[in-house]
């Protein structure tokens, strides 16, 4: 799916960010990107911060017995932002990693924000360190990075959560929207592909159906 929009695979050694509201289909796209990496002979790290990853959905989208597929997926399910940091540290020890996915990059971060300035400063530093470690491990392993992000209200409607830090370090940013049964991916930022391109699709039980691609 993302390959269609980006005119190629997810770029190595950089961050690709997909943002959109809950239930719009971000995890489905993560699973398809994961399956594509596995088909290319690589393993995938999947950090699931929101409990969105479903083994049954992997089976539906792969159309195969997923026992063999699961051998190539390293899944982490952190319940705190500190555990998310620890999961990223563990990736340095893994081999043959083609793609690192964090489904809900700031979900746990936002849960732990509070009225204490010192605690929030600590969280911001931890987020910065996580982004740094992500890029270090991706460059070391020659891996792609795919993150999903929540949205927040802004003067222009909605925008990605996580502030300018995630916006700056994400070399590709893709907005995912939903109108009834149709979803739309829009490429908002990219170093090589044409910004503004969009792809409309439907989510089916056994996959995603592309409706059209426009510019």
Curated annotation (Swiss-Prot):
Q: Which GO terms describe its biological process?
A: DNA recombination; DNA repair
Q: Which UniProt keywords apply?
A: ATP-binding, DNA damage, DNA recombination, DNA-binding, Nucleotide-binding
Q: Which GO terms describe its molecular function?
A: ATP binding; ATP hydrolysis activity; ATP-dependent DNA damage sensor activity; damaged DNA binding
Q: Which InterPro entries match?
A: AAA+_ATPase, DNA_recomb/repair_Rad51_C, DNA_repair_and_recomb_RadB, P-loop_NTPase, RecA_ATP-bd
Task of the protein: Involved in DNA repair and in homologous recombination. May regulate the cleavage reactions of the branch-structured DNA. Has a very weak ATPase activity that is not stimulated by DNA. Binds DNA but does not promote DNA strands exchange.
* Entry's family note: Belongs to the eukaryotic RecA-like protein family. RadB subfamily.
Matching entries from PANTHER family are given as: DNA REPAIR AND RECOMBINATION PROTEIN RADB, RECA/RAD51/RADA DNA STRAND-PAIRING FAMILY MEMBER
Identify this protein by name: DNA repair and recombination protein RadB
- Species in which this protein is naturally found: Methanococcus maripaludis (strain C7 / ATCC BAA-1331)
